[in-house]
């Protein structure tokens, strides 16, 4: 696992603004449900995952700095694997050798009131919404912070489509918060999170 090196709040905020500008210019970009994001305090974004570029529209939608937790073996873009941790502080996780330092790093960010983004499916491979992993629920319950079910729509294969005369539609939808407490069951919260994500997605997803 590569240790994250988050840039300053200002630099990451500028990256968020730049992401919003880029998404707005290159795609028909829209955001729904932003009122569901807590105005302060830490929370966990739990989006579906269909393409390596999914963090870009999420960053654009939130703008404020986010700490991403992503599986290193699932990232297929070599430039992003090298650029993400250096520029923004993405935590790349080796799932075959998960280290205690990974958990400590995320805990540290939560204690600093950071927004955390974890893709519960853990992969972009396969069709449709896949089974959720337990990481989102684990960190939410451990810290008693809300989960924000999130839908990312329209990013699959988007890099190959950019540059054509037609601007593709890309949308980010934030669902209602799932509030957690220390007594909650991890599997129940995981199932509820995936159920709420599914509600936000198109029927033909």
Where are these regions (language model features)?
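Glycine-rich helix-loop-beta junction characteristic of Rossmann-like nucleotide cofactor-binding loops
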Residues: 34-38
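A transmembrane-helix-recognition feature enriched in membrane-embedded lipid enzymes
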Residues: 2-33, 57, 78-88
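Short, basic, glycine/proline-bearing loop/turn elements
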Residues: 18-19, 87-93, 119-124
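Catalytic core of membrane glycerolipid acyltransferases/transacylases, capturing the structured
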Residues: 39-97
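Non-catalytic C-terminal accessory region of glycerolipid acyltransferases
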Residues: 1-10, 41, 100-205
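Short, well-ordered alpha-helical scaffold segments within catalytic/effector domains
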Residues: 28, 52, 100-103
């Amino acid at each position: 696992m590569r240790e994250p090196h988050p840039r300053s709040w200002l630099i990451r905020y500028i990256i968020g603004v730049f992401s919003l500008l880029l998404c707005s210019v290159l795609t028909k970009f829209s955001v729904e449900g932003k009122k569901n994001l807590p105005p302060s305090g830490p929370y966990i974004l739990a989006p579906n995952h269909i393409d390596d570029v999914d963090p870009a529209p999420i960053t654009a939608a939130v703008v404020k700095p986010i700490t991403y937790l992503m599986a290193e073996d699932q990232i297929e873009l070599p430039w992003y694997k090298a650029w993400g941790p250096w520029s923004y502080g993405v935590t790349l996780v080796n799932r075959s050798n998960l280290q205690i330092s990974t958990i400590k790093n995320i805990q540290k960010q939560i204690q600093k009131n950071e927004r955390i983004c974890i893709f519960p499916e853990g992969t972009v491979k396969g069709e449709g919404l896949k089974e959720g992993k337990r990481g989102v629920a684990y960190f939410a319950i451990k810290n008693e912070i809300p989960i924000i079910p999130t839908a990312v729509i329209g990013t699959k294969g988007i890099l190959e489509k950019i540059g054509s005369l037609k601007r593709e539609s890309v949308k980010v939808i934030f669902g209602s918060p799932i509030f957690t407490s220390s007594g909650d069951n991890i599997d129940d919260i995981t199932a509820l999170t995936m159920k709420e994500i599914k509600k936000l997605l198109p029927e033909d997803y």
